[in-house]
Amino acid sequence: MGRGKIVIRRIDNSTSRQVTFSKRRNGLLKKAKELSILCDAEVGLVVFSSTGRLYEFSSTNMKTVIDRYTNAKEELLGGNATSEIKIWQREAASLRQQLHNLQESHKQLMGEELSGLGVRDLQGLENRLEISLRNIRMRKDNLLKSEIEELHVKGSLIHQENIELSRSLNVMSQQKLELYNKLQACEQRGATDANESSSTPYSFRIIQNANMPPSLELSQSQQREGECSKTAAPELGLHLP
């Protein structure tokens, strides 16, 4: 069974991308060396990795190769303006073709203009869509998981705040109840004292004296033990004829 067609696009996984770069870099350097030996060509190869590391190969001397390239480029561009125009025209045509291919690929991914695709092309498109959907779902699941964890944290904080507020309300209610009971007790004592002072009974008694005619005395009755006053009760003398 033959190898499947590899889609040429950027590798998202950094580890896989580094492994692929290492393998293909070694293969490219090997091919450049073989080309210089087999065809007696002067070859200069410069490669920069995504991290900025330099890899190079030259069949003779890299500086010599670069100088030769610079001189040839200047002769090509400076000697003939028409050639420069043609070069830019080819570059523009290549960019237009790349843009067209990208637009076609985008339409196919959106399910448009599929009539010109064969079974293999459709299978490749389906595989690309499945990979895209898998990546989208994975990203969505990660976002939802993060949001759920954040909501759990917020819920725990709110629950703790509610507990603290409930405790504070209970303390305030207890203090309010104690204050209310004290106020009620004070009001009851005040009312009792007022009733006792306003309803103190009076009694009459007849005082007889040998030297004086009999008289009628008005006096307050003795209050409850421990609450009566030590002052003498007022006397109202009525002399009988």
Curated annotation (Swiss-Prot):
PANTHER family: SERUM RESPONSE FACTOR HOMOLOG. GO terms for molecular function: DNA-binding transcription factor activity, RNA polymerase II-specific; protein dimerization activity; RNA polymerase II cis-regulatory region sequence-specific DNA binding. One of its GO terms (cellular component) is nucleus. Disruption phenotype: Increased number of tillers. It comes from Oryza sativa subsp. japonica. This is MADS-box transcription factor 57. One of its GO terms (biological process) is regulation of transcription by RNA polymerase II. The keyword GTP-binding does not apply. Keywords: DNA-binding, Growth regulation, Nucleus, Repressor, Transcription, Transcription regulation. It is found in: Nucleus. Pfam families: K-box, SRF-TF. InterPro entries: MADS-box/MEF2_TF, MEF2-like_N, TF_Kbox, TF_MADSbox, TF_MADSbox_sf. Interacts with TB1. Residues 85-178 form the K-box domain.
